[in-house]
């Protein structure tokens, strides 16, 4: 397994950071979102508030990074609940069972490890 970081993900991560740092709409963040959208000939976005800008970044990440296995990490990173799926109930942010347990073999080899809460 080799982790791959696409350029669009880098741009969207920077846009999200800029959006979260400011108190209003950051022009650089909007430009980064629109750079990603321009690659696929999508219409540019022009959010009017900080919340709308953050929502636009998260939506674009969902579209751009679909099916790449990053959904759960997105929810954990942004502090949002993980939505329910066909056979799995919604998991609240901070729930004991959102993060998997550390394998016992790893715990046995490193006595300084602390098991994740709930296991």
Place the predicted regions along the sequence by residue.
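Acidic/polar-rich alpha-helix caps and helix-coil junctions
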Residues: 1-119
